Amino acid sequence: MTSVTRSEIIDEKGPVMSKTHDHQLESSLSPVEVFAKTSASLEMNQGVSEERIHLGSSPKKGGNCDLSHQERLQSKSLHLSPQEQSASYQDRRQSWRRASMKETNRRKSLHPIHQGITELSRSISVDLAESKRLGCLLLSSFQFSIQKLEPFLRDTKGFSLESFRAKASSLSEELKHFADGLETDGTLQKCFEDSNGKASDFSLEASVAEMKEYITKFSLERQTWDQLLLHYQQEAKEILSRGSTEAKITEVKVEPMTYLGSSQNEVLNTKPDYQKILQNQSKVFDCMELVMDELQGSVKQLQAFMDESTQCFQKVSVQLGKRSMQQLDPSPARKLLKLQLQNPPAIHGSGSGSCQ
């Protein structure tokens, strides 16, 4: 009975006990007692694990199971010495503490994977290439999603199973062709290549370092330009302030009465308003424009008449020359006239010849 009461007291005051008391108990034990302690601790841990399994397997039995389990533990504790009981309850307290910590800070596990999803990867042959397996996985996952979507759409209004399956088959064919194209292009194979990725990473790092250098250079250049701009702005402000002070110093106020009585006022008042004059004479300018247009048209007509008359005179002179040449006998004068016909004379000469 004393052992039971002592064990209950230790069980109630277990969380408050310190590590120094545990160390004192372990140092006071002999090697035989230490071996007995370890065996007892193993038995108690096994009992605690059996208790957890029993509670997890039958949580609905209530207090009967707890009472029987407590009686079994008490019967075990009667066969142990006080030191062994304290050591066993210390181990039990530590195991309970670890269990409580695990229960409070336990990481939540993910939901179990659906069995059909795992069968997708198992149905693909391992002997195929990695790119081919990836394409098959894409196609099979699409077909699996179609199969899971079909029962949900059957209850909707206006759903046609035949059209849905026809569209699904056409889409699967398109996806198959697309996956084959990706395989032939080498896009799927790039997903499994590490060397190219490392090379691209190195090139990316080099380009990033180069860009950082350019950014630092541009930032320094921007700072210099900003400093130069501030310098010029300060100089411009100083120049404006100086100009305003000089204008205030050299400014001379003139009264309006003296300005109105000067000779400049008379000159400004006698200045004609040319814009008003032009507006008044706009009709005259329009008539002059019409007259000039008519004169230009008449000059063009006279020039055309002169061209036609010259052409007519040339034709008449040629005809008269042919007639006169036919009446003459072969002679040196005829040859001379032929030469003259080859070089046509001027208008006045032809007119005089025709008159003769």
UniProtKB/Swiss-Prot annotation:
Q: Does the keyword Cell cycle apply?
A: yes
Q: Where is this cross-link: Glycyl lysine isopeptide (Lys-Gly) (interchain with G-Cter in SUMO2)?
A: 253
**What UniProt keywords are attached to this protein's entry?**
Cell cycle, Cell division, Centromere, Chromosome, Chromosome partition, Isopeptide bond, Kinetochore, Mitosis, Nucleus, Phosphoprotein, Ubl conjugation
Cell compartment(s), UniProt: Nucleus; Chromosome, Centromere, Kinetochore
In which residue ranges is the amino acid composition biased (Polar residues)? 75-89
Query: Tell me, what is an example of a GO biological process annotation in this record?
Result: attachment of spindle microtubules to kinetochore
Q: Which residues carry this modification: Phosphoserine?
A: 28, 30, 58, 77, 81, 109, 125, 331
Bias category Basic and acidic residues: which stretches? Answer: 8-25
Quote the cellular component terms of the Gene Ontology held in the record: azurophil granule lumen; cytosol; extracellular region; fibrillar center; kinetochore; MIS12/MIND type complex; nuclear body; nucleolus
Q: Which InterPro entries match?
A: Dsn1/Mis13
What main location does UniProt list?
nucleus
Which residue stretches belong to region Disordered?
Answer: 1-28, 73-93
Quaternary structure, from the entry: Component of the MIS12 complex composed of MIS12, DSN1, NSL1 and PMF1. Also interacts with KNL1, CBX3 and CBX5. Interacts with KNSTRN.
- Protein task: Part of the MIS12 complex which is required for normal chromosome alignment and segregation and kinetochore formation during mitosis.
The protein's name: Kinetochore-associated protein DSN1 homolog
Species whose genome carries this gene: Homo sapiens (Human)
